[in-house]
Amino acid sequence: MVSFKQVRVPLFTAIALVIVLLLAYFLPPRVRGGGRVSAAAITWVPKPNVEVWPVDPPPPVNFNKTAEQEYGDKEIKLPHWTPTLHTFQVPKNYTKANCTYCNTREYTFSYKERCFYFTKKKHTWNGCFQACAELYPCTYFYGPTPDILPVVTRNLNAIESLWVGVYRVGEGNWTSLDGGTFKVYQIFGSHCTYVSKFSTVPVSHHECSFLKPCLCVSQRSNS
C-alpha cells in the first residue's frame, strides 16, 4: 500500500490545482455554468441567401448611337425631360464677330491674341449665343479647340462647368462658329456641349436648358 507521503506531486501541478479550486469557489454561478445561462448554447445559423440583382451587369451604352438606333424611338422618355433629337438650328443673327476688342478689366484670361470670358450670369446653352454677342463688342459664343481647351479648364475650379459653343445640326459633324470639326464625348440626341475642370474634350449634355456660365471670346488687336 502506498502512503500519502510517498506520492510526489510536481510543484507546477499543485499550483494549477489550487488555482482551479479557487476559481471554482469564487466565480459567480453564471460563469461556472450554473443558473439559467448554463442552459444556453451556441446555435450556428447558416448564412442566408443574398439575392444580388441584376445577376449580370447591364450591357455597355454605346454613346455613338442615337436614341432611335438604341431604343427604336426618336424621343428619350425620362422622368423630367423629353428631348427631341436633332432639332437645333444655329440662331441666324449670331455669328463669329469680324472685329477686334478686349476688355482687359473683365476678361477671365487672354491667350493667343484672344480674350476669353466666363459670363458671370448663368444661361441656357441656346441663350449663350445671345449672351456672348451682347457681352462686349466683338464677343461671340466660343467652341474651344484642342489647343485652347486645357487653358480653359485650368481656369475652372473642381466644381465648375460652363457651356461651350461646340454643336451639331442634325446628323452632321460637331462644329463651332469658327468652323472645323470637333471630337465630342456624346450623349445621344444632344446638340449642346459643356466642359468642366477635368474635361479632355467637350461633353454633350442631356439637358440644354440647364443654367451655366458661357464661354465667350473676342479677337484681340495686335497693336
Swiss-Prot record:
It is found in: Virion membrane. Residues 1-8 are intravirion. GO terms for cellular component: membrane; virion membrane. Keywords: Disulfide bond, Host-virus interaction, Lectin, Membrane, Transmembrane, Transmembrane helix, Virion. One of its GO terms (molecular function) is carbohydrate binding. The chain crosses the membrane at residues 9-29. The keyword Transmembrane applies. Disulfide bonds join C99-C138, C102-C115, C128-C214, C132-C216, C192-C208. SUPFAM superfamilies: C-type lectin-like. Residues 111-217 form the C-type lectin domain. The C-lectin type domain is essential for virion-induced membrane fusion. Belongs to the epstein barr virus gp42 family. Plays a role in virion attachment to host B-lymphocytes, through binding to leukocyte antigen (HLA) class II and subsequently participates in fusion of the virion with host membranes. May act as a tropism switch that directs fusion with B-lymphocytes and inhibits fusion with epithelial cells. This is Glycoprotein 42. It comes from Epstein-Barr virus (strain AG876). The lineage of its organism: Viruses, Duplodnaviria, Heunggongvirae, Peploviricota, Herviviricetes.
